[in-house]
């Protein structure tokens, strides 16, 4: 429990005709705080795993509608929900192999259900962000089926087709270059019908579109317009920095590495110098309707690359915090580095978990060998919602959900079945398990058999149970998000690491012209004493929140005094009174 080292002070109480691609927009200097997505919190829903209403064991759009109040103003207080892909798909990459970008997969419901979801969400002040998979399609997409059938048809040049670079002595055609697949193995697949290779960064059933073909760009932007016309408020762009490849498809340089993918410098198959021009054209489409946003998923890149591709009002995911261990030195370094790289002119994102990575409750506690997973998850919630940038909260994190051990025969993640001595992979099924709504059979997720097994701890890690407990992780998230919404410094303030913070405490201030907020995390399972720093605004700090004691609030402490913090505790304080 958070406490002073002496007795505390008293409490005080869509579809449009094809059109020419627009010219690049002029990137204007951002005014941080002008837009909802800078101040707000975005909640990622994995539709298969959120709530099932028809008993088939797979989540659906009606299930999301039924639980909007959980994420809305009366619940978490989320500003927007991001839906992982809801489009028709053969399901070989669990929805990221899209066969039609313009409609809803019947597995999840109908177009009417989607329109009702938009309407019901908007009525609650919740915006809708769609996942756009535009780097590649399914090999069952009509575009690819037409493209593979003919070298001369209207879709012949829509994908990355190339002739072989030669032939082996036995006559086997050789790939055009040395590019490989992120999922292991070669990146080029031979198509007998065309007598050519096509490229795929991921599965062979996910052929890459040729974004340098103007017809591809026009079709994609038409699709974007269609979803905007249906009321969508934003887009998450899957692996967006891989859209453009080198015009000549040059081979990548080699380097030392632990897998075929890591043994290449990916200079020519992503991050092309004219990529920002393409994104500017995309942003022109989105910006035609006020209040819309987009966030790009940086595919296998650095924080410097993320900052470089963040311009104007565009967000880009960076993975620095998502990959950092629960270690004070590592967290201090990561927080300071990402803020310095983005600087004052670019707006970052913050994410600790998603559908491709271990849940942060499991990952962070394991990285420190800390058995108190709940305490680590709660302190990490403070980190997520108080560092500078737009927070993205993955469904179930508000309960402190852990990864679930999935036996290999139950895995629903194709690359996990390809693991060998030259290809390592973490089974993503483990972080995609169903949302537990109650302690009832099947956790209130379905009346049937869930598509993935539930975690063993749903008896306590479920919405109904935690909603009734003031000290639960869910209650903490509700308080945290409400506090953030009422505290401009936590939304749009500058970030300054606290100099002199050492040992196990990671501390930083968030400041606006009118407000100064101090955040401190004890990144250790051991108790610690920590001296509160001075503030140019005040000689006192008022406690706003403690992860160790839901009742602790309004205690005032003088700058320079020491406080005691429990293991894995985080506190938020505000400067009060004259300096």
Task: Give residue spans per PLM region.
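C-terminal beta-strand-rich structural cap/linker in extracellular carbohydrate-active enzymes
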Residues: 555-579
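Solvent-exposed beta-hairpin/edge-strand motifs
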Residues: 534-550
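Acidic/aromatic-lined carbohydrate-recognition and catalytic surfaces
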Residues: 2, 11-14, 18-225, 229, ...
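Loop/helix patches that line or flank the sugar-binding groove of alpha-linked glycan CAZymes
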Residues: 11-14, 36-38, 248, 253-270, ...
